[in-house]
């Protein structure tokens, strides 16, 4: 502001429990008042800001919807992943997973030989990869060590490199988004945009897109193994349910594009 350079906040979202709206949040409210304009995701954010005297606000939606649509349109062709999946296998893609997530879906995977699993853990250091491998009871291969021969002989593909997850979701029948048993879930839209059901843990409340996916019946939140098992059992045996859930997820992701 000393140099008279405009400052904007884009694709912001505000919640009632944030410090800006507390009686002791004056310093933080002053920071918001320094913005020339705030472009927010929803009407609720605009109302909260109005109550603290901030009126330079426009509701424009969430730019991430346009971004994930662009990512889908530019998705990489991954021949080894396609070969691993094969023609008929029910493939479960777990993205940005952490240990507590992995404990649940690996238990299910180990006891269900009819399915295949692609894991793209959030942390891909050697210690975490070894930890994942120690829990597996079925054949696996790391992506960086996969080839046209060994990828046909395994049931689990571990993505041990960055930059592929947003393209990999399209090879799954169902996606699991990690982080819901820790600080909060990761990006649900990257999976939903492919029109597949989305599953995540119980800590999703800070993410409006996750809440709306649940409301649209394009996603389901689970809190323990029994709930995950019941959901995956149904997805594998009720094709209509799986396709309708996926269609709901895809429609939600696409319906909010081009609003920014």
Language-model regions: role of each:
Residues 241-254:
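A short, well-ordered alpha-helix in the C-terminal region of glycosyltransferases
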Residues 257-260:
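Conserved small/polar residues in nucleotide/adenosyl-binding loops
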């Amino acid at each position: 502001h000393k140099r008279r350079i405009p400052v904007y906040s884009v694709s912001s979202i505000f919640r009632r429990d944030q410090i800006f709206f507390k009686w002791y949040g004056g310093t933080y409210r002053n920071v918001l008042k320094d913005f020339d304009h705030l472009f927010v995701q929803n009407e609720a954010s605009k109302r909260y800001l109005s109550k603290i005297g901030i009126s330079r606000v426009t509701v424009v939606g969430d730019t991430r919807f346009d971004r994930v649509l662009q990512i889908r349109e530019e998705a990489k062709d991954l021949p080894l992943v396609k070969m691993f999946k094969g023609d008929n296998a029910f493939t479960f893609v777990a993205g940005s997973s952490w240990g507590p997530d992995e404990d649940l879906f690996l238990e299910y995977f180990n006891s269900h030989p009819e399915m295949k699993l692609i894991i793209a853990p959030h942390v891909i250091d050697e210690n975490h990869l070894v930890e994942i491998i120690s829990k597996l009871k079925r054949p696996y291969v790391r992506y960086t060590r996969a080839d046209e021969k060994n990828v046909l002989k395994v049931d689990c593909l571990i993505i041990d490199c960055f930059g592929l997850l947003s393209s990999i979701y399209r090879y799954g029948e169902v996606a699991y988004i990690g982080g819901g048993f820790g600080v909060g879930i990761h990006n649900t839209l990257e999976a939903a945009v492919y029109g597949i059901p989305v599953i995540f843990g119980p800590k999703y409340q800070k993410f409006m897109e996750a809440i709306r996916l649940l409301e649209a019946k394009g996603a389901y939140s689970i809190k323990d193994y029994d709930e995950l098992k019941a959901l995956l059992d149904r997805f594998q045996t009720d094709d209509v349910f799986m396709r309708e859930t996926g269609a709901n997820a895809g429609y939600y992701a696409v319906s909010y594009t081009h609003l920014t």
